[in-house]
């Protein structure tokens, strides 16, 4: 078992917490991390890009001039893709880019990222996020003792004051423990867990 120091919201050490090595001392597997990020981004795509083929472009079907004798190139339709106002050949059409990644591979990718963060002292565990108000200024004042540039806070959705007070801060993201993913874990340089959140995450990843 690994031991990590538990701090309060003011960055004072209050206790220690044991973390399982099979989750927080997992080897770095870059190929799994790559696949997990690719899967996450593909699932986020709207897939609404659409172009008009020659069959969808508006315009008459009349032949513009006779086939032979004019000296000009032959043309059958004003909607021909060769023309500026014509249709698009092989353009993008609406499609679903999402696909499923094996659950075990996805979990192992998350273990790999979390273990790497912990090895580099980029994971903090806080006993609890007790806030007096949902004002952004007050929350940032309490977090000022932690040295970070981009922070991912993992707690429970029930903590509405924390969610509301950080949602407008561009360099902080607060999520429920069930929403943690490889992409956000990589995007934010530091991760801050509440004790309850990290315990529940361990139960999920076991």
Placement of each model-derived feature along the sequence:
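Extended polybasic, low-complexity segments that bind anionic RNA or targeting/receptor surfaces
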Residues: 1-46, 91-206
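A short, flexible low-complexity segment enriched in Lys/Arg and Gly/Pro that occurs
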Residues: 30-68
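Glycine/serine-rich anion-binding loops at beta->alpha junctions
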Residues: 54-90
């Amino acid at each position: 078992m690994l031991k990590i120091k538990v701090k309060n919201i003011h960055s004072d050490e209050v206790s220690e917490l044991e973390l399982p090595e099979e989750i927080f001392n997992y080897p770095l597997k870059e190929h799994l991390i790559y696949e997990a990020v690719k899967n996450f981004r593909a699932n986020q795509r709207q897939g609404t890009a659409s172009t008009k083929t020659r069959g969808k472009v508006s315009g008459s079907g009349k032949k513009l001039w006779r086939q032979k004798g004019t000296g000009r190139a032959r043309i059958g339709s004003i909607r021909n893709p060769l023309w500026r106002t014509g249709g698009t050949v092989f353009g993008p059409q609406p499609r679903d880019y999402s696909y499923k990644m094996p659950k075990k591979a996805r979990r192992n990718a998350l273990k790999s990222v979390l273990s790497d963060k912990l090895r580099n002292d980029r994971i903090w565990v806080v006993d609890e996020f007790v806030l007096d108000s949902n004002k952004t200024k007050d929350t940032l004042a309490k977090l000022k003792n932690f040295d970070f540039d981009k922070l991912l806070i993992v707690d429970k959705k029930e903590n509405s004051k924390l969610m509301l007070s950080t949602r407008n801060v561009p360099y902080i993201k607060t999520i429920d423990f069930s929403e943690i993913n490889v992409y956000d874990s990589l995007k934010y340089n530091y991760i801050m867990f509440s004790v309850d959140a990290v315990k529940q995450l361990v139960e999920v990843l076991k």
